[in-house]
């Protein structure tokens, strides 16, 4: 019996790497706001705040475009692919006669360690820790049938959405609160833009703890945290359902279902996003984001199986194969660009310029990923992660042909 090893190139589902590469780039377009200015605090203040007063029309246009097409959609896509990946890994382990649960627990523990280091030592906006913690809950659903996973996913998502349907969530606050949050934002601009390494480290930890408080991590009530994370977890379940249904393995056998999903994504996704742009109601985003995400997925799946277009889409494949490395490198590069220990541009770059910086970083990552994978089988952080998962150092260099 052959030993269980990480998925190799010839065993991969090509369109997944393309989708993963697109998702990791889309996430950077959204995350750049948090890299370059105190977006977490400014979002609490709403549209009327001291920082947005400096924006030009181009900045507002750039922010609106990102909000319409990318915000929330790409992180939901990445969550969908996470759930999909668990099933692929489980099926492969079972085919090799290996126990899956211990393997996946080690994988999640390693991810949790990486995420914690990332969150407190590099960038406070880390999502890896949440994925790792939710991954343990996902394990409970590993044997569920696709229909069961679908029912759970939809039910949980509706449970999360109901409060937004029943109330307008008036976020008006007293003047003292506004002044306190404004001061927090100004402090972040000062520290990240001109502070010492010690100051930046303390600010990063402070901001991370604020974030963890806002999403329920620090309430010491797992239910509070899980409720705040339902959108991600629902996509985990949908991804697992799609993998078990073989929707992306064998798309030609699911043409009708994929076409219906494409139409629903187009009509409902675009329609809800238009309403969100006009009304700014969160419920419209909650409806529109997953549908628009599935519109993107089905469009890419369809185009990927068109020979001429596949060549273009495959340019994202190397990025997707190194998604873990690229995600972490985005944090390392962008904090260097914006924090004082690097170029010190924090608080000086607005959305329009931020889009250009994002495009430049993505272009460099695409070239780097292609060059790296010419020599190596996987990215450097993928190598560390998989070595921890399989409890042995994995071969990383490609075998040279004699």
UniProtKB/Swiss-Prot annotation:
Coiled-coil region: none
Regions crossing the membrane: 13-33, 68-88, 108-128, 149-169, 223-243, 261-281, 283-303, 327-347, 353-373
Pfam families: DUF418
InterPro entries: Bact_Transport_Assoc, DUF418
Cellular compartments per GO CC: plasma membrane
Localization in the cell: Cell membrane
Keyword hit for Transmembrane helix: yes
Membrane protein topology class: Multi-pass membrane protein
Keywords: Cell membrane, Membrane, Transmembrane, Transmembrane helix, Transport
Major localization listed first in the record, in broad terms: membrane
Cited function: Involved in transport.
Protein name: Uncharacterized protein YxaH
Annotated source species: Bacillus subtilis (strain 168)
Gene expressing this chain: yxaH
């Amino acid at each position: 019996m052959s030993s269980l090893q990480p998925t190799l190139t010839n065993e991969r589902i090509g369109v997944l790497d393309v989708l993963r590469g697109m998702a990791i780039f889309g996430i950077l377009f959204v995350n750049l706001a948090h890299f370059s200015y105190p977006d977490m605090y400014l979002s609490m203040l709403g549209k009327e705040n001291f920082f947005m007063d400096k924006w030009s029309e181009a900045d507002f246009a750039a922010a609106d475009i990102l909000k319409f097409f990318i915000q929330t959609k790409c992180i939901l896509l990445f969550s969908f692919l996470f759930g999909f990946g668990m099933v692929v890994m489980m099926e492969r382990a079972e085919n090799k006669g290996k126990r899956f649960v211990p393997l996946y627990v080690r994988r999640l523990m390693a991810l949790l360690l990486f995420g914690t280091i990332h969150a407190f030592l590099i960038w406070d906006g880390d999502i890896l820790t949440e994925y790792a913690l939710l991954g343990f809950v996902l394990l409970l659903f590993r044997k569920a049938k696709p229909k069961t996973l679908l029912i759970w996913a939809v039910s949980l998502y509706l449970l999360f959405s109901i409060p937004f349907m029943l109330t307008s969530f008036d976020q008006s606050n007293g003047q003292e609160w506004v002044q306190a949050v404004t001061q927090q934002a100004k402090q972040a601009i000062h520290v990240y833009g001109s502070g010492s390494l010690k100051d930046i480290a303390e600010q990063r930890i402070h901001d991370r703890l604020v974030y963890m408080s806002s999403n329920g991590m620090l309430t010491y009530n797992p239910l509070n945290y899980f409720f705040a994370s339902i959108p991600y977890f629902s996509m985990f379940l949908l991804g697992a359902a799609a993998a078990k249904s073989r929707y992306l393995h064998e798309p030609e056998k699911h043409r009708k279902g994929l076409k219906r999903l494409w139409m629903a994504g187009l009509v409902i996704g675009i329609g809800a996003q238009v309403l969100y742009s006009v009304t700014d109601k969160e419920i419209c985003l909650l409806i529109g984001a997953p549908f628009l995400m599935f519109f993107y997925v089905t469009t890419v799946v369809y185009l990927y199986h068109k020979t001429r277009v596949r060549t273009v889409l495959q340019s994202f494949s190397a990025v997707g194969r190194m998604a873990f490395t690229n995600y972490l490198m985005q944090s390392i590069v962008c904090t260097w660009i914006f924090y004082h220990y690097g170029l010190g541009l924090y608080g000086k770059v607005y959305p329009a310029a931020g889009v250009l910086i994002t495009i430049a970083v993505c272009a460099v990552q695409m070239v780097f990923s292609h060059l790296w994978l010419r020599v190596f089988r996987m990215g450097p952080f993928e190598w560390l992660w998989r070595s921890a998962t399989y409890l042995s150092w994995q071969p990383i260099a490609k075998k040279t042909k004699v």
